[in-house]
Amino acid sequence: LSGSEKIYKAHTKFKFVRNRNFEVYGEEKNMIFHYAGKYNGDESSLPYKEHHPNATPFKEPEDTKKLSLIANVGCILIMGILAIPFLILGIEYIPDNAIWMMIGGICGGLSLLPHELLHAICYKKDVYMYNDLAHMLMFVVGTEDMSKGRFIFMCLCPNLILGIIPYILFLIFPQFVGLGLFGIICIGMGFGDYLNIYNAIKQMPKNSKTYLCGMHSYWYL
């Protein structure tokens, strides 16, 4: 293998591949994770597939700049709303938990990578991860077909594990203010996923399937 192609075998039945040329290694039945590096802004450089004859594009933002703007504004709004019960319940615990607040905030800010990895493990075939840190984005792209339910689960998975569950635990045990702050940040960072879930629920008919091609989602019956 060359220096840019390092394969890491996990205990589960998938492999991690660093590969910028979209070559496939290993058995077909294994999910293979490809770290593709920095997104260059050219959608034609992303993985693509031949469109299904009856494919209909999602009505969604056309480029990463518009998407990042919507996602960042939505993120701030959601975190602002969630901060209200956080302050009401946790205000008395914050002074004595400054270190845990700092840890929760730092971990929340660093959760972008595990967030995308949790998206990736929902795929059964090749999935590619890119970073676009100039627009505060990381994203994964996989071109396999998914049912409406699996697509919604894939979008929701990291937000549930990293955000919603920790925040609910804080609501039950408000002394865990660091965990609550972590949950707030992780829930807010998933705003782009909530847009995808909304689009799937609103636009995809019953029994339809969806797939990604470049930056855009399509559905078909």
Residue ranges and their predicted role:
Residues L1-N30:
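N-terminal amphipathic/basic-hydrophobic helices that include classical n-h-c signal peptides
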Residues F86-P95:
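Short, hydrophobic transmembrane alpha-helix segments
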Residues Y128-M136:
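Peri-membrane helix termini and adjoining interfacial loops of integral membrane proteins
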